Structures are given as C-alpha cells and as structure tokens.
Amino acid sequence: MDPCDCSKSGTCNCGGSCTCTNCSCKSCKKSCCPCCPSGCTKCASGCVCKGKTCDTSCCQ
C-alpha cells in the first residue's frame, strides 16, 4: 500500500480503492495516483511532482 498525503490542493485516498482528484501530491507513488501533469513521463519507481510543469523536477 503506497502512502499518499495530498491535502494541499486536491484529495488523495490511497487505500483499498485509490481515488485522486486535482492531486498535488509531493510523495504519491505512481501505482496509486498519477500525480504528474499530463504529458510528463511517468517514473517506474514512482511519481514525485514539484509543481504543475513538465520538466526535470517533475519526476525523479
């Protein structure tokens, strides 16, 4: 089960049934919620987003 703390500008529920709405997670695993902006390459190890732009700091 991936931890997800997303109370900033959206709602994330990472549990048995994961839901993600307007998510701006800083530590949300890709397997739970796709928190990277559309067009960003998803990371195999998980997605860490810093903002809503698609650059090298979006996923690491």
UniProtKB/Swiss-Prot annotation:
Gene3D superfamilies in the record: Metallothionein Isoform II
Binding of a divalent metal cation 4, residues: 32-33, 43, 47
Chain segments carrying region Beta: 1-28
Residues involved in a divalent metal cation 7 binding: 49, 54, 58-59
SUPFAM superfamilies documented for this protein: Metallothionein
Chain sites annotated for binding a divalent metal cation 5: 33, 35-36, 49
Residues noted as binding a divalent metal cation 3 in the record, renumbered to the chain: 14, 18, 23, 28
Binding site for a divalent metal cation 2: 6, 12, 14, 25
Region (Alpha): 29-60
UniProt record similarity statement: Belongs to the metallothionein superfamily. Type 1 family.
Protein name (record): Metallothionein A
Gene (UniProt): mta
